[in-house]
Amino acid sequence: MAHKKAGGSTRNGRDSEAKRLGVKMYGGQVIKAGNIIVRQRGTQFHAGYGVGMGKDHTLFAKIEGVIKFEVKGAFGRRYVSVVAA
């Protein structure tokens, strides 16, 4: 009898779609108001002057200018600011 018993199914075989997080615009670049600077989970980067934060912690420019990344404070927090050009 050349028969083969059916194999069981696996519980693996799934993978989530990439979320495309990260820094979208870098220091020294000119940016327009409303453009996204960083997409992140939590506050890896904090909003400085001229930068707003969305409900998913996305940082975006509130004014037109040049992006500036800086580390400030006793905790070494990373801030993103937009300096008017």
UniProtKB/Swiss-Prot annotation:
Disulfide bonds: none annotated. It comes from the Bacteria. The keyword Coiled coil does not apply. The keyword Ubl conjugation does not apply. GO terms for cellular component: cytosolic large ribosomal subunit. Keywords: Ribonucleoprotein, Ribosomal protein. HAMAP family: Ribosomal_bL27. This is Large ribosomal subunit protein bL27. It comes from Pseudomonas fluorescens (strain Pf0-1). The gene is rpmA.
